[in-house]
Amino acid sequence: MADGTDQKSSNQMWGGRFASGPSAIMEEINASIGFDKKLYAQDIRGSIAHATMLAEKGIISQEDKEKIVHGLNTILSEIEAGTFEFSRKLEDIHMNIEARLATLIGTAAGRLHTARSRNDQVALDFRLWVKEELQKTEGMLTALIAAFLDRAEENADTVMPGFTHLQTAQPVTFGHHCMAYVEMFGRDRARVRHAIEHLDESPIGAAALAGTGYPIDRHMTAKALGFREPTRNSIDTVSDRDFALEFLSIASICATHLSRLAEEIVIWSTPQFGFIRLSDAFSTGSSIMPQKKNPDAAELVRAKTGRINGSLVALLTVMKGLPLAYSKDMQEDKEQVFDSAESLELAIAAMTGMIRDLEVRKDRMRAAAGSGYSTATDLADWLVREAGLPFRDAHHVTGNAVALAEKKGCDLADLSLEELQAIHPDITNGIFDVLSVEASVASRTSFGGTAPSEVRKQIAWWRGRN
């Protein structure tokens, strides 16, 4: 017909109720095979477990089960060999596989969908995929944490400026700074592990939404598929995409941490800072400026964070107004997750490589740590400890000392004892013991502090947990 409508239903899986097939536009908007074919392995794995359970419970014959399993394994081989022909008319990965199975083994293929709906089938496939992706992310985060632990250990004594408002605040060590990222990515990994535990329930057997009257064994399929147990409410099971939202939330938080790190890499690799040199492996040049070495990998990690954040908001918006149980809107869940997973994998891998390969310029860090009056807090603390001043008074006295040093264009340690005593008479020569950045760093021995001894304790604690 002129409008692209088939006279017969183009989809024999559900077309019995229809007098004519869908229009070409309907087929285009309805089809998901372009992206959900990524779930082929999970779909086949779930179908094998389902068929095995059906045979075990006497719902289908052992002979049909063996034909189904053999046919599904044949399809798996075809897909992985690149010889399988996907059809948009068959909408999705489930129907593409089932149609091919019917071609391979005949009527026995029609028994596979007994006690099953595409609603619980896709919930299973997608949940399996997200679970596997989370496990992969866990391993990648472990590698990134290991890279930071190595850097922290190498630089437990490397003095650098610590910043607030991107202005020099107090001296810290680069090892301590690296350990801050270990904590961040450690929390990300903990969220990943919690998410795996959260989704460790099998949806298969919930059917369309109400369960099934067949004597199935959902615990059997759950165990076969590596889940802790089956889900407990069939309506919630087919309408739940919390596991996808949780994955995107974790990805978004992790990407935010990666983006903060990327920003520091971009800044620190500039000639103006010069704290680090990126390896050639994670840099690019300019087509016109021969001297340029651009931190493109870090910049792209930073950019991908916006993409991942957008995916989270997109799926939250899809889900926010859906009545129970299943709606076709939920087909829009997968592309957001697939894209974010790919972006996150790339970002973590790139950042792990950058951290392992970067050159730390200790001399530049040390020089910067000594500028900006970074030991002013140490002066104030000395006045509290040694001169007995209340901290607020000590803060004021120190501010006067900074103003004088600023006026003279020198560091605090370059002020004479006479100049300091003119600001406060109780200052003694002992003040100069705390005004070096090394002394400042060494004094920060509180739990979690920047003193090299504390940094090494932090590293040891994480080594035992990574």
From Swiss-Prot:
Q: Which PANTHER family match?
A: ARGININOSUCCINATE LYASE (PTHR43814:SF1)
Checking NCBIfam families in the record gives: argH
Instruction: Identify the gene encoding this protein.
Output: argH1
What InterPro entries does its record include?
A: Arg_succ_lyase_C, Argininosuccinate_lyase, Fumarase/histidase_N, Fumarate_lyase_CS, Fumarate_lyase_fam, Fumarate_lyase_N, L-Aspartase-like
What catalytic activity does the UniProt entry give for this protein? 2-(N(omega)-L-arginino)succinate = fumarate + L-arginine
Which one of the record's GO molecular function terms can you name?
A: argininosuccinate lyase activity
Offer a single GO CC term for the protein.
Answer: cytosol
Q: What is its EC number?
A: 4.3.2.1
Keyword Transit peptide found: no
What is the protein name for this chain? Answer: Argininosuccinate lyase 1
Keywords, A to Z, come to: Amino-acid biosynthesis, Arginine biosynthesis, Cytoplasm, Lyase
- What SUPFAM superfamilies does the record tag this protein with? L-aspartase-like
Q: Give one Pfam hit by family name.
A: Lyase_1
Keyword Lipoprotein belongs to the record: no
Enzyme class, first EC level, given as a word = lyase
A single BP term in Gene Ontology: arginine biosynthetic process via ornithine
The text of the family note is:
Belongs to the lyase 1 family. Argininosuccinate lyase subfamily.
Q: Where in the cell is it found?
A: Cytoplasm
Q: In which pathway does it act?
A: Amino-acid biosynthesis; L-arginine biosynthesis; L-arginine from L-ornithine and carbamoyl phosphate: step 3/3
Disulphide bond pairs: none
* Main location, first listed in the record: cytoplasm
Q: Which domain of life is it from?
A: Bacteria
Q: What Gene3D superfamilies does this protein map onto?
A: Fumarase/aspartase (C-terminal domain), Fumarase/aspartase (Central domain), Fumarase/aspartase (N-terminal domain)
